[in-house]
Curated annotation (Swiss-Prot):
Residues 222-240, 301-309, 361-391 are extracellular. The keyword Transmembrane applies. The keyword Transmembrane applies. It is linked to Defects in Tmem79 are the cause of the spontaneous matted (matt) mutant phenotype, a model for human atopic dermatitis. Atopic dermatitis (ma/ma) mice have a matted hair phenotype with progressive dermatitis-like skin inflammation and a scratching behavior. Mice display an altered skin barrier that facilitates allergic sensitization. Contributes to the epidermal integrity and skin barrier function. Plays a role in the lamellar granule (LG) secretory system and in the stratum corneum (SC) epithelial cell formation. This is Transmembrane protein 79. The gene is Tmem79. One of its GO terms (biological process) is epithelial cell maturation. Its main location: other. Keywords: Golgi apparatus, Lysosome, Membrane, Transmembrane, Transmembrane helix. Residues 1-114 are annotated as: Disordered. GO terms for molecular function: identical protein binding. It is a multi-pass membrane protein. Residues 103-114 have a biased composition (Basic and acidic residues).
Length: 391
């Protein structure tokens, strides 16, 4: 191909490939490696800076021009693999576009939303645990606090939230049924318990008069001669001392249960083993007051022959309280029998006192005169009084 044809071809390709400068760099590197520079290379450098064609300003003859012409051909435009890539022309004139800040914000927003997916109650439940704090003894902790200054103490763990116990769980023991019994919720179990309690009270109603009559008829003792009202009241009070025995015994057991089960706090959670004895003592004291108040009034209306009932009723009170205590501690519905042996005599004495006060001797309701049952018509002289011979 002749030189004019080559120039014509370059003129036709110039607007299409104005940015192809890698062949020039390749020619420059090859010349630098050779160590010699030709005037054609200088013209190539000047031409590359100005942006005009290179071959027109160089010499027409010489091997360098041939190489430059061959390098500018379309089939020789591929850069050498080891050659550095040049910057595209006009890159300095391009204004840098501002970075879009919306993309990272969009990526951060779902991250923030994912961080708070757990509800607030669940997040509070996760409390960091320090194994050193758990394994540390109280003495070591005191030493560390003493050695550290006032400004060095820091709380790394957040304050633990106290989860109050729901009120439903406080009475869970009362709701739970015994494991050995199965109840379908039909209410038959409660009916059976009530039936047993009523049956035990009815048994006490039948057994109480039989026991009292048998003791009155067969026990070998008689009441002393008590002609005055004051002597009868003193005799009743002395008999009442024996009735305090089960109450004092209950107080002793109650105190021991407080010590054994460490239930010394007055407003602490009640324990079953302690509450049994406490309720027994409280109920016994109440019944003792009512029982012996009516017994003292009854002693002023009884004739001399029937004063033997005073010690018998006192003994019945003590025995019935012990029976009730035993059955109440076991948790049986049969405890109604012991309660009936205490309440039924109390009810009988109340009815007897009201009958004498309003029917037999209404004039002596609020006076302290002697009873006409003993004086003067129904009284026996001291010489006529003989104790019964037993044996």
């Amino acid at each position: 191909m002749t030189e004019p044809e080559t120039l014509a071809l370059l003129d036709m390709k110039e607007p299409e490939t104005p940015e192809k400068s890698p062949p020039q760099a390749l020619v420059l590197q090859s010349e630098e490696e050779g160590g010699t520079e030709s005037p054609g290379t200088e013209s190539l450098r000047v031409g590359s800076s100005v942006g005009s064609p290179i071959v027109r300003e160089g010499p027409e003859d010489g091997p360098d021009s041939t190489i430059s012409e061959a390098a500018t051909l379309p089939w020789g435009t591929d850069p050498h693999p080891s050659a550095p890539l040049p910057d595209p022309p006009g890159w300095r004139d391009i204004e840098p576009e501002p970075l879009e800040s919306e993309a990272p914000t969009k990526s951060e927003e779902p991250f923030k939303e994912d961080a708070n997916l757990l509800p607030e109650k669940t997040v509070r439940a996760f409390v960091p645990i320090d194994l050193q704090c758990i394994e540390r003894k109280p003495q070591e902790e005191r030493i560390l606090h003493r050695d550290a200054g006032p400004g060095e103490l820091r709380n790394f763990l957040p304050a633990r939230l106290s989860h109050p116990e729901p009120p439903e769980r406080k009475w869970a023991e009362a709701v739970v049924r015994p494991p050995g019994r199965s109840c379908g919720g039909c209410g038959s179990c409660g009916g059976r318990e009530a039936l047993r309690a009523v049956a035990s009270v009815v048994a006490a109603l039948i057994f109480f008069p039989c026991l009292l009559y048998g003791a009155y008829a067969f026990l070998p003792f008689d009441a002393p001669r008590l002609p005055t009202m004051s002597s009868r009241l003193v005799y009743t009070l002395r008999c009442g001392v024996f009735a305090t025995f089960p109450i004092v015994l209950g107080l002793l057991v109650y105190g021991l249960s407080l010590l054994c089960f460490s239930a010394l706090r007055p407003f602490g959670e009640p324990r079953r083993e302690v509450e049994i004895h406490r309720q027994y003592v409280a109920q016994s004291v109440q019944l003792f007051i009512l029982y012996f108040f009516n017994l003292a009034v009854l002693s002023t209306y009884l004739p001399q022959d029937t004063l033997k009932l005073l010690p018998l009723l006192t003994g019945l009170f003590a025995i019935s309280r012990l029976i009730y205590w035993l059955t109440f501690a076991v948790g049986r519905s049969f405890r109604g029998f012991g309660y009936g042996l205490t309440f039924l005599p109390l009810l009988a004495m109340l009815v007897w006192n009201l009958y004498y006060m309003f029917v037999v001797e209404p004039e002596r309701m609020l006076t302290a005169s002697e009873s006409r049952l003993d004086y003067p018509d129904h009284a026996r002289s001291v010489s006529d009084y003989r104790p019964r011979s037993w044996g």
